[in-house]
From Swiss-Prot:
Scaffolding protein that regulates epithelial cell polarity by connecting ARF6 activation with the PAR3 complex. Plays a redundant role with FRMD4B in epithelial polarization. May regulate MAPT secretion by activating ARF6-signaling. This is FERM domain-containing protein 4A. Residues 358-420 are annotated as: Necessary for interaction with CYTH1. SUPFAM superfamilies: PH domain-like, Second domain of FERM, Ubiquitin-like. Residues 366-386, 553-680, 713-756, 772-813, 879-968, 980-1039 are annotated as: Disordered. It comes from Homo sapiens (Human). Residues 579-939 are annotated as: Necessary for tight junction and adherens junction localization. InterPro entries: Band_41_domain (IPR019749), CUPID (IPR021774), FERM/acyl-CoA-bd_prot_sf (IPR014352), FERM_2 (IPR035963), FERM_central (IPR019748), FERM_CS (IPR019747), FERM_domain (IPR000299), FERM_N (IPR018979). It is linked to Agenesis of the corpus callosum, with facial anomalies and cerebellar ataxia: An autosomal recessive intellectual disability syndrome characterized by congenital microcephaly, low anterior hairline, bitemporal narrowing, low-set protruding ears, strabismus and tented thick eyebrows with sparse hair in their medial segment. Residues 366-382, 788-800, 946-966 have a biased composition (Low complexity). The modification Phosphoserine is found at S530, S604, S615, S681, S711, S800, S872, S901. The keyword Ribonucleoprotein does not apply. The gene is FRMD4A. GO terms for cellular component: adherens junction; bicellular tight junction; cytoplasm; cytoskeleton.
Length: 1039
C-alpha cells in the first residue's frame, strides 16, 4: 500500500495498472488528493482519512462516490477500492468522507472529534438539501451556525456578509422566500437571542434540533412499485421505510429489522420478506412459512444493488449495537459535552491550521497523511490531557469532601431525630431515596427539687435518706423506661432488667432505712417504694438464665396451678396472673426445675386449618415429662396420665389441660402426626432416604444430643397412645418416624437451589402446605432446626426398612420424596423461535450473516441469524425428556411430592428409569416382600426382648422407647400386604430404577430394633438416638 502523487496528464491505462488518482472531500470543505494502488482496500483508505483527524470512532463513517447513473454509492470496506463501479471518464475519482450510520443522540459519542464531525455532516446535509427542513427551522439553525463560527452578535452588516460566506441557507429556503433580505432578517432575529452562548452550547443546541427532525439519519432512494407508482425507500439503523414521493416526513410503511426475514435483489427488483401473521399463506409464491409477506420495488440495476448493499450494512450496524449494548458507555450530559467542545476549540484549528486556506488541495506523500503541524497539535493535546487530569483529580477530591460532610450531616440529623422523634428536613436524601425510620430514644433525664438536693449545714440522718430516696426513685424510673424498651436485643434487655432490679432493691433498702428512723422518732413508716415496685413491674422474658424459649402467646394455654416462687429481691411482690412463671432461679437445681416448668406445653407450628384430615396440633399440645419420670416409669410399657402427672411433682395438673379428651401423647417428638394413609393417593408414598453417615459421626452426634435437655432425641421417643389395657387401638392420625423424609416436616430445605439445577415441583395435595409463613418466631425456628438435625440423624440411622436407594449421586433420589432436582449437563438455550419476531444471537462477537452475492445480477441476504437448536431444548423438550420414563406406567401418572425437610441433590432421574423399568420394580417389590416376612417372623422375639433390659435411668429410657416402637410395628403389620402392592405401584420410576444390585442382595438384620446397630456399628444401648430407627413397617416406603 502506497500513496503517491502523479501528474494530471497520466494515461488511463497507467491508472488501471499502477493506480488511480482519487480526491477525498472532507467535511470541512477541504480536499485530500491521493493515488490509490490496485491492492488498497476500502477499509485501509478509511483508516488513512480517519487518521487525518485522529478519529477513533470510525465505525460511524464511510466513503461514498457517485456512479455513472448519478446515484450515490458507498465503498464496501471488505473490497478493494478500485473494484467498485467508478465512472469510466478520465480525471480523479471524487470520494466523499461523511457519516454513514447515525445514532439517537450525540451524547453516546465518546470523542469530541466525532461530535464535531457529526455537526459538520449535519450542516452539509441541510445545505445540500439531503434533509427536508422547514424554512423557519432553517433560519434558527443558521443563527446557531453564526454563533458557533463568529460568536455573539455585532451588527447587521457583519451578519449579512457572514451569511453569504457560510453554508447556512439552502436553496430551497430561498425559493420559498424570494426576498433575501427577509431571510437575513429572520436569521438576525434568532441570532440576537443567542448572545452569551459558547461555541459548545451552540453546537449542542444545533444538533438537538437536527436530531429531532424525522428525516435525519435516513438514506433515501427513488423506486417504483409494480404499478409504476414512484416512492421513496428510506434505510436507517431502525429498519426500512416507504414514503410517498411528495412526502419524505411521514412513512407509509415501516419494516423494522426484527420483522424482516430475507433481502433479495435480482436485476431491477429489490424484495424483502416480512413477518405478517395476518397474511394468508396463498400470497407466498415460494415455499416457506405461511406468515411471510413479500414486498417488492423496482429501479435500475445499479441503484437496486446499491439499495441492497446499504440495507445489509444498516442491518449489520443494528446487530452490532444490539449485541454490544452492555458494552456501551453511559451517555454523557449535553452540558458536559458543551464544556468540552468549548475548551478544545475548533476541529480545523487544532488539526488543519497549517494546511492552508479552505479549498486548497492537501497532498500526501510516502503514505503519510498527517499534516506538518501534527507534532505541535500532539504536544498541545498532551498538555490539555494533563490539565484535564489535574482538574479531574481536584473534582474527585471535592466530591470526597462533600461526601464526608454529607455523612456528618446525616449523623447529626439522626441524633436529633432520636431525641425529638422526627427527622429534620435538612436530612440529605438522594433522588428516589426513602427517609429512614427513626425510633425515638427512651428519655432518662429527670429534675429534682434543689431544696431536697442541696444540704443545709448539719443535716439530719432522716433528711439525708430522704434526699437519697428522691434521687434513687428517679434513677429507678429511668431504669424502668430503659428496661421497657422492646426494640433492643435480648442481651441488652437482660442487662437493663438486671439494672432495674438492682435499682429497685436499693430503693427498697433506702426506704427500709427511712422507716427505721421514722419508727425511732415515733413517726408512721411509709410504703412509697412498694408502690413504685407495684407500678413498675414490666412484662419480659423469664428465661434470662436459660436458652430454652417459650413464646408469649402460649401463656393462655397454661392452666396449671404453679405455686408462685418468691423473688430473691426484697420488696418485689408476686407476679400478676398473666405472668404466672417463676423468676430466674439462682441455683443449678432451680434452673433444672424451671426448665420443665416452662416447657409444659409446646404449641404446634402448623395452623389447624391447613389440615383437613385430622387435627395435627394435638400431638404438640403435650406434657413435657421430667427427667425423673424416666426413672420411675421405666418398668411400665405405656405410662398413664396419672403417672405422668405425679412425675411432674404435683405442681402441674392435667385435669384442665387442652389435651384432656385426646389420647395422651407422652413423646418428646415434635413431628406432626400422619393423616390416615388409607385416604391418601398412592403417589404420595416415598422411599427411605439414604444418608451416608459414618459410625464415628453418629456416635459423636449421639453424645451431643444426649447432653441437650431440650433436644428431641435425649428424652427418647414414645410412639404409643393406648390405654393401660394395652389394646392395639390407635388414634386416627397415626404417627410417623421423624427420619427427615416426612413431606409434612417444615419447609426448609437443607440444600440450596443452584443455578445449574432445575427443580420441577410436584402436584401437592390441598391438605399439605408450607410452614414458613406460619412460624416466624425465632424460638420456633430454633426448635425446627433441632428437629431437622434430629430428622437427618434419624434418617441416617433408620433401619426399619432396607436401603432401597442407590448411594452416591442417585442415593438421595429415594429420600427426595416428591420433586426432583435435575442437574443438566448443558444448560438449555435461552432463545426460542417466536412466530412474530426473528431470533438473533446475543452472545456472539459478530452477527451471523448469510450472504450470497456471487454476480452483479442477483443476490440474497438472510436477515434472520441462522441458529440451530437441539430437539431436547426446544419448546419443552427438556421437560419431555426428563419425564419420559414414566409415560407408560399407570402408577407414574402422579407427580412427585417434594420433601419438606431435606431434599438431596440428584441427577436426572427420569432418564435412568427409562432403561430397566420392569427390573427395578420387580427388585423393589421382592425386597419389600422379604423384609415383611422377616419382620413378621421376628416380632415375638422383639416383644420378649423389650422386657429384659436394664432398670437404670439411661437404659430404661431407651428400653421403653424400643419396646413401644416394636409394639407400633406389630400393630400396623396387618396392613403391610396392601401397602407393599401400593408402594410398588406408586414409587416413581426413577426411584425404582436406581436400586443398586449390591444393596438388593444385602440381607439386613431381621430385627428392626437392631437395624441401627447394623448400619452404624454402635450398640443400641449406647446410643440414645432411636426415634428414627423404630418406625412402623410401612414407614420407610410411604415417606
Amino acid at each position: 500500500m502506497a500513496v503517491q502523487l502523479v501528474p494530471d496528464s497520466a494515461l488511463g491505462l497507467l491508472m488501471m495498472t499502477e493506480g488511480r488518482r482519487c480526491q477525498v472531500h472532507l467535511l470541512d470543505d477541504r480536499k485530500l488528493e491521493l493515488l490509490v494502488q490496485p491492492k488498497l482496500l476500502a477499509k485501509e483508505l478509511l483508516d488513512l482519512v480517519a487518521s487525518h483527524f485522529n478519529l477513533k470512532e470510525k465505525e460511524y463513517f464511510g466513503i461514498a462516490f457517485t456512479d455513472e447513473t448519478g446515484h450515490l454509492n458507498w465503498l464496501q470496506l471488505d473490497r478493494r477500492v478500485l473494484e467498485h463501479d467508478f465512472p469510466k471518464k478520465s480525471g480523479p475519482v471524487v470520494l466523499y468522507f461523511c457519516v454513514r450510520f447515525y445514532i439517537e443522540s450525540i451524547s453516546y459519542l465518546k470523542d469530541n472529534a466525532t461530535i464535531e464531525l457529526f455537526f459538520l455532516n449535519a450542516k452539509s446535509c441541510i445545505y445540500k438539501e439531503l434533509i427536508d427542513v422547514d424554512s423557519e427551522v432553517v433560519f434558527e439553525l443558521a443563527s446557531y451556525i453564526l454563533q458557533e463560527a463568529k460568536g455573539d452578535f455585532s451588527s447587521n452588516e457583519v451578519v449579512r456578509s457572514d451569511l453569504k460566506k457560510l453554508p447556512a441557507l439552502p436553496t430551497q429556503a430561498l425559493k420559498e422566500h424570494p426576498s433575501l433580505a427577509y431571510c437575513e432578517d429572520r436569521v438576525i432575529e434568532h441570532y440576537k437571542k443567542l448572545n452569551g452562548q459558547t461555541r459548545g452550547q451552540a453546537i449542542v443546541n444545533y444538533m438537538s434540533i437536527v436530531e429531532s427532525l424525522p428525516t435525519y439519519g435516513v438514506h433515501y432512494y427513488a423506486v417504483k412499485d409494480k404499478q409504476g407508482i414512484p416512492w421513496w425507500l428510506g434505510l436507517s439503523y431502525k429498519g426500512i421505510f416507504q414514503y410517498d414521493y411528495h412526502d419524505k416526513v411521514k412513512p407509509r410503511k415501516i419494516f423494522q429489522w426484527r420483522q424482516l426475514e430475507n433481502l433479495y435483489f435480482r436485476e431491477k427488483k429489490f424484495s424483502v420478506e416480512v413477518h405478517d401473521p395476518r397474511r394468508a399463506s396463498v400470497t407466498r409464491r415460494t415455499f416457506g412459512h405461511s406468515g411471510i409477506a413479500v414486498h417488492t420495488w423496482y429501479a435500475c440495476p445499479a441503484l437496486i444493488k446499491s439499495i441492497w448493499a446499504m440495507a445489509i450494512s444498516q442491518h449489520q450496524f443494528y446487530l452490532d449495537r444490539k449485541q454490544s449494548k452492555s458494552k456501551i458507555h453511559a451517555a454523557r450530559s449535553l452540558s458536559e459535552i458543551a464544556i468540552d467542545l468549548t475548551e478544545t476549540g475548533t476541529l480545523k484549528t487544532s488539526k488543519l491550521a497549517n494546511m492552508g486556506s479552505k479549498g486548497k488541495i492537501i497532498s500526501g506523500s510516502s503514505g503519510s497523511l498527517l499534516s506538518s503541524g501534527s507534532q505541535e497539535s500532539d504536544s498541545s493535546q498532551s498538555a490539555k490531557k494533563d490539565m484535564l487530569a489535574a482538574l479531574k483529580s481536584r473534582q474527585e477530591a471535592l466530591e470526597e469532601t462533600l461526601r464526608q460532610r454529607l455523612e456528618e450531616l446525616k449523623k447529626l440529623c439522626l441524633r436529633e431525630a432520636e431525641l425529638t422523634g422526627k427527622l429534620p428536613v435538612e436530612y440529605p436524601l438522594d433522588p428516589g431515596e426513602e427517609p429512614p425510620i427513626v425510633r425515638r430514644r427512651i428519655g432518662t433525664a429527670f429534675k429534682l427539687d434543689e431544696q431536697k438536693i442541696l444540704p443545709k449545714g448539719e443535716e439530719a440522718e432522716l433528711e439525708r435518706l430522704e434526699r437519697e430516696f428522691a434521687i434513687q426513685s428517679q434513677i429507678t424510673e429511668a431504669a424502668r423506661r430503659l428496661a421497657s424498651d422492646p426494640n433492643v436485643s435480648k442481651k441488652l434487655k437482660k442487662q437493663r432488667k438486671t439494672s432495674y432490679l438492682n435499682a429497685l432493691k436499693k430503693l427498697q433498702e433506702i426506704e427500709n432505712a427511712i422507716n427505721e428512723n421514722r419508727i425511732k422518732s415515733g413517726k408512721k413508716p411509709t410504703q412509697r417504694a412498694s408502690l413504685i415496685i407495684d407500678d413498675g413491674n414490666i412484662a419480659s422474658e423469664d428465661s434470662s438464665l436459660s436458652d430454652a424459649l417459650v413464646l408469649e402467646d402460649e401463656d393462655s394455654q397454661v392452666t396449671s396451678t404453679i405455686s408462685p416462687l418468691h423473688s430473691p429481691h426484697k420488696g418485689l411482690p408476686p407476679r400478676p396472673p398473666s405472668h404466672n412463671r417463676p423468676p430466674p432461679p439462682q441455683s443449678l437445681e432451680g434452673l433444672r426445675q424451671m426448665h420443665y416448668h416452662r416447657n409444659d406445653y409446646d404449641k404446634s407450628p402448623i395452623k389447624p386449618k391447613m389440615w383437613s384430615e385430622s387435627s395435627l396440633d394435638e400431638p404438640y399440645e403435650k406434657v413435657k415429662k421430667r427427667s425423673s419420670h424416666s426413672h420411675s416409669s421405666s418398668h411400665k410399657r405405656f405410662p398413664s396420665t396419672g403417672s405422668c402427672a405425679e412425675a411432674g411433682g404435683g405442681s402441674n395438673s392435667l385435669q384442665n389441660s387442652p389435651i384432656r379428651g385426646l389420647p395422651h401423647w407422652n413423646s418428646q417428638s415434635s413431628m406432626p402426626s400422619t393423616p390416615d394413609l388409607r385416604v391418601r393417593s398412592p403417589h404420595y408414598v416415598h422411599s427411605t432416604r439414604s444418608v451416608d453417615i459414618s459410625p464415628t459421626r453418629l456416635h459423636s452426634l449421639a453424645l451431643h444430643f444426649r447432653h441437650r435437655s431440650s433436644s428431641l432425641e435425649s428424652q427418647g421417643k414414645l410412639l404409643g397412645s393406648e390405654n393401660d389395657t394395652g389394646s392395639p387401638d390407635f388414634y386416627t392420625p397415626r404417627t410417623r418416624s421423624s427420619n427427615g423424609s416426612d413431606p409434612m416436616d417444615d419447609c426448609s430445605s437443607c440444600t440450596s437451589h443452584s443455578s445449574s439445577e432445575h427443580y420441577y415441583p410436584a402436584q401437592m395435595n390441598a391438605n399439605y402446605s408450607t410452614l414458613a409463613e406460619d412460624s416466624p418466631s425465632k424460638a420456633r425456628q430454633r426448635q425446627r432446626q433441632r428437629q431437622r438435625a434430629a430428622g437427618a440423624l434419624g434418617s441416617a440411622s433408620s433401619g426399619s426398612m432396607p436401603n432401597l436407594a442407590a448411594r452416591g449421586g442417585a442415593g438421595g433420589a429415594g429420600g427426595a420424596g416428591g420433586g426432583v432436582y435435575l442437574h443438566s449437563q448443558s444448560q438449555p438455550s435461552s432463545q426460542y423461535r417466536i412466530k412474530e419476531y426473528p431470533l438473533y444471537i446475543e452472545g456472539g462477537a459478530t452477527p451471523v450473516v448469510v450472504r450470497s452475492l456471487e454476480s452483479d445480477q442477483e443476490g440474497h441476504y438472510s436477515v434472520k441469524a441462522q441458529f440451530k437448536t437441539s430437539n431436547s431444548y426446544t419448546a419443552g423438550g427438556l421437560f419431555k425428556e426428563s419425564w419420559r420414563g414414566g409415560g407408560g406406567d399407570e402408577g407414574d401418572t402422579g407427580r412427585l411430592t417434594p420433601s419438606r425437610s431435606q431434599i438431596l441433590r440428584t441427577p436426572s432421574l427420569g432418564r435412568e428409569g427409562a432403561h430397566d423399568k420392569g427390573a427395578g420394580r420387580a427388585a423393589v417389590s421382592d425386597e419389600l416382600r422379604q423384609w415383611y416376612q422377616r419382620s413378621t417372623a421376628s416380632h415375638k422375639e422383639h416383644s420378649r426382648l423389650s422386657h429384659t433390659s436394664s432398670t437404670s435411668s439411661d437404659s430404661g429410657s431407651q428400653y421403653s422407647t424400643s419396646s413401644q416402637s416394636t409394639f407400633v410395628a406389630h400393630s400396623r403389620v396387618t396392613r403391610m400386604p396392601q401397602m407393599c402392592k401400593a408402594t410398588s405401584a406408586a414409587l416413581p420410576q426413577s426411584q425404582r430404577s436406581s436400586t443398586p444390585s449390591s444393596e438388593i442382595g444385602a440381607t439386613p438384620p431381621s430385627s428392626p430394633h437392631h437395624i441401627l446397630t447394623w448400619q452404624t456399628g454402635e450398640a443400641t444401648e449406647n446410643s440414645p438416638i432411636l426415634d428414627g430407627s423404630e418406625s412402623p413397617p410401612h414407614q420407610s416406603t410411604d415417606e
